[in-house]
Amino acid sequence: MIFTPPVWGPEMMAIPASRPIHEFLVERDSRHLYDWSEEKPALTIADRVDALARSLGRELGWSPNTGSPWSKVVGIFSFNTLDFLVASWAIHRIGGICMLMHPTSSAAEIKRHIELTECRVLFTCRSLLPTANEVLVASKVQDPRAYLLDLPEELGRKPSLPDQGQQTVEQLISAGATLPLIEALDWAEGQGKEQVAYLCPTSGTSGLQESALTVKKLAMITHYNIIANIIQATTFEAGPKKGRTEVALGFLPLSHSYGLILAHLTAWRGDTYILHARFDMQAALASIEKYRIERLYLVPPIISALVNNPFLLDLCDTSSVTSVVTGSGPFGPRLAEALSRVRPSWQVLPGYGLTETAVIISITDPNITYPGADGCLVPGVEARLINSNGNEVEAYNEPGELLLKSPSIMKGYLGQETATREVFDEQGWLRTGDIAVFRLTGQDGKVTPHLDIVDRKKDIMKVKGLQVAPVEIESHLAAHPAVAEVAVVGVRDEDAGERPYAFIVRSPRTMADLDEEALKADLNRHVEATLSEPHWLRKNIRFVEEFPKSSNGKPLKYKLKESLATSYARKTSPAIPNNTRNR
């Protein structure tokens, strides 16, 4: 059975297949595309992109229609800044490919990606410049270059680190404005479907085929993929938003696909996007009051922190907020209920997506919701479910591995043909590795299928022959006031086959007076009051200071599981990963 978007949804416009991203954005909403900050005057994005492209062309000897795009790979290794997107679009303007690198990535991982792509040019910021220079030297690339992006907090300050002669993007733009115009991109019909725009690192939280270095795969995302997803998401929200623009909070890293697509999406539809260099809770809350922000794009751990520390929301005026969009991790109904109690006027809109789908697959319509679900498929997406026996699911409310088709799906993984073959089936469907269910509602006379992600396929455990999803336990524990963060993995058990094991970061302010054993007892009562026996934890709870995490903040469950495997089989206390420790 093929599951599709709601039949009542609006019709999607044709997706341009022969235009680069920056041309598509400027063509649609040039009146909105301004680069504004309190430190420098407003300039059109188009002007800045073109001037930077001219400078890069002169500096590097590149031109838009000469040479392979793979000979013009440029990395961006920086925290968020207004010129992050300007730099990426300037790279596209001269026919190049932009490789994203997360600021928390190790030097070894960045070096591996540079060697894989033969990248010799990096955009970075002053705080990351030493690492960037170290990697460029260690990679032994010819004629390495590093250019500096200014972060808001760095503007007007004396640099704490020497620049070592690197030019800033602002200097390049100023110089480029005086240079002759460069030729327009001359693309063949349909070239946008083949031309890679971004190389995006995947999260790798399950450790699938990863080495000890945990080098992430690079998803090849084309111009067509990004443009398609902009149109898909905007079309779906055209009904609820009725063409109205919003002021949105943006602190999600642009180096991660979720943050990247949101920045493109809000730019195209004309929203105001208040960009933060990095996440800081107090700064984010203050900006809500200052800019009267209406929409928050959050991830579940941040929502959990707000729910467990509600006093934070009283530090500033947050009355302007009307909606919270959440993704990049499971968001259970218990956490939604907890947020609703703290801020009942905020409408929570869960969604689902992957780096490999660039990015958005489902969005919640604020008028038609299903508690605990992840929204409806956006236009252009098709889905299938394959059950544990390898058979296709032919009904609603039956779980199976989610397979997808969408115009936004990547070309594949760079340099990893085996991984690419494994992630696509023989008919070209993307295997997500997520277990999902489609559920129907009939609100307002509209029959609506809702996507509900149950768990990661490889994270599902079997307890006494019954399938148990860690996300169910996690969502219950996340709603407990003493829990700041939680990750549940399956461990071997002689009697049941497997049992759930919870790693928990305690909230520093709530129930802090309880000793560990008393809190474990309270957590067990919390779980056992609502979940069946296969979900119970009993002694399988351990408190830690922090989790090993991926670059986008997801707990690395495979590291937690590795630390437990040997010790749990011997019925001894499990070892804690290197970057965690007991309370």
UniProtKB/Swiss-Prot annotation:
GO terms for molecular function: ATP binding; CoA-ligase activity. SUPFAM superfamilies: Acetyl-CoA synthetase-like. Residues 351-413 are annotated as: SBD2. Residues 280-350 are annotated as: SBD1. It is an enzyme of class 6 (ligase). Its EC number is 6.2.1.-. Pfam families: AMP-binding (PF00501), AMP-binding_C (PF13193). Disruption phenotype: Eliminates the production of fellutamides. Acyl-CoA ligase; part of the inp gene cluster that mediates the biosynthesis of fellutamide B, a mycotoxin that acts as a proteasome inhibitor. In the first step of fellutabmide B biosynthesis inpC activates 3-hydroxydodecanoic acid to generate 3-hydroxydodecanoyl-AMP that is then loaded onto the T0 domain of inpB. The 3-hydroxydodecanoyl-S-phosphopantetheinyl-T0 is sequentially extended with L-Asn and L-Gln by the two CAT modules of inpB. The linear lipodipeptide from inpB is then transferred onto inpA for the addition of the third amino acid, L-Leu. Belongs to the ATP-dependent AMP-binding enzyme family. This is Acyl-CoA ligase inpC. It comes from Emericella nidulans (strain FGSC A4 / ATCC 38163 / CBS 112.46 / NRRL 194 / M139) (Aspergillus nidulans). The gene is inpC.
